[in-house]
Amino acid sequence: MDNKAMYLHTVSDRDNGSIFEEPFDGRSLSKLNLCEDGPCHKRRAGGCCTQLGSLSALKHAVLGLYLLVFLILVGIFILAVSRPRSSPDDLKALTRNVNRLNESLRDMQLRLLQAPLQADLTEQVWKVQDALQNQTDSLLALAGLVQRLEGTLWGLHAQAAQTEQAMALLRDRTGQQSDSAQLELYQLQVESNRSQLLLQRHAGLLDGLARRVGVLGEELADVGGALRGLNHSLSYDVALHSTWLQDLQVLVSNASADTRRMRLVHMDMEMQLKQELATLNVVTEDLRLKDWEHSIALRNITLAKGPPGPKGDQGNEGKEGKPGSPGLPGSRGLPGERGDPGLPGPKGDDGKLGATGPMGMRGFKGDRGPKGEKGERGERAGDMDFTMIRLVNGSGPHQGRVEVFHDRRWGTVCDDGWDKKDGDVVCRMLGFHGVEEVYRTARFGQGTGRIWMDDVNCKGTESSIFHCQFSKWGVTNCGHAEDAGVTCTVP
């Protein structure tokens, strides 16, 4: 705002008429042209213009002053509306000055309108000049306040610009933190899915192990029952055999006593037999002598024989006699030692295939295989081209709308050509075994943002949906009403 200096004159300058020497140029309020016809530096004989023309010029000057004040107020209000608020003290001082200026101008206008035409016009002009001098001081003070207000507003504007820059930087950092948090949340979700699958697999293994332990417990119970029965039977057999052994010991002791007694009897009978044999030999000799004597007497005693010679040698053993009749059966003998095992018998026929047993425990990790051949060089990825995938708006982590993360933003997948092969790849990326059902036409609600993938065509063997054939990133002819979705299988 341009502040023009106002050159005002005091009451002592009335005589020289200096206030009428320069025309009123619309900028200086102190040098008023009270004539109606432009520059009036030529004074009339009466010392001034006519009263009617001077009054008209004064009214025009007051109206111009009113218009100037109005424009100043309009500018102040525009600045107040377009800029941030200033301090309350400056606004209160500015409001008081404007109100005082309005009241002074209103009083001046009323005095001018009510003043009689016959009054001394020169006195009225000097009074107006004094009033304008006072108003000029007020306007100068008001201009200073406006300048200070404008400086304060510019300072606030600079602070607001700095604040906007800081807010933009904060929004960028917040967006980066949000993207990082979303990526970490996705990774945690994938790890959670894998952990759930591992827990379910371990639960299945534990169930199988529990069943096997139960079957083994039943078998152990059967074996224990069989062992108890065998123990009972063996105890009975051992007791029976002990009884038999005791009886056998009694029989053996009796047999030993009988044997000793029979040996004594045999010895006695042997002595008797020896005595009988000796007696029999004597008798035999006597009989032989008697027989010889008789034979000599009966024959013609022509030859005389001498006495018998000594006893001859024992003759040859006679022929073996016939076997006698079998005797009575004796008691059962002790069991003999166990014989050698016999030869193995012929192989029997194959039996029927039994039921499949429970799944065994996981084996040890095998040896590392040979190093494979070097693959072809892949395409170079971008610095920020880190792609991920998630399921949104489903009843659980196993189902929902398919969204991929590309270029630091999440986007959806169009259902053009969407089938179970594509869904199977997506589910295996998320750690599930496979896909149960695929959906089209935004079954889980319409997404927002970009549609990153369209015309997806997977073979079903890919490890990632980004290895499948599809149109370029963000190139699509679909809307969010065609967002694809899946439901993965949960064991």
From Swiss-Prot:
Q: InterPro entries in the record, alphabetically? A: Collagen (IPR008160), SCARA5 (IPR034726), SRCR (IPR001190), SRCR-like_dom_sf (IPR036772)
Q: Which cysteines are joined by disulfide bonds?
A: C414-C478, C427-C488, C458-C468
Which keywords describe this protein according to UniProt? Cell membrane, Coiled coil, Disulfide bond, Glycoprotein, Ion transport, Iron, Iron transport, Membrane, Receptor, Signal-anchor, Transmembrane, Transmembrane helix, Transport
Per the record's keyword annotation, is Glycoprotein included, yes or no? yes
Q: Where does the record say this protein resides? A: Cell membrane
Q: In which tissues is it expressed?
A: Expressed in the testis, trachea, lung, bladder and small intestine; especially in epithelial cells associated with mucosal surfaces.
Glycosylated positions are N102, N134, N193, N231, N254, N300, N393
Pfam families reported in the protein's UniProt record:
Collagen, SRCR
Q: Where is this region: Disordered?
A: 301-380
Domain (Collagen-like): give its ranges. Answer: 305-356
Instruction: Specify the SRCR domain's residue ranges.
Output: 389-489
Spell out the Low complexity composition-biased ranges.
323-334
Q: Which family does it belong to?
A: Belongs to the SCARA5 family.
Give the record's subunit note. Homotrimer.
Protein name, per record: Scavenger receptor class A member 5
Q: Which organism is it from?
A: Mus musculus (Mouse)
Gene name?
Scara5
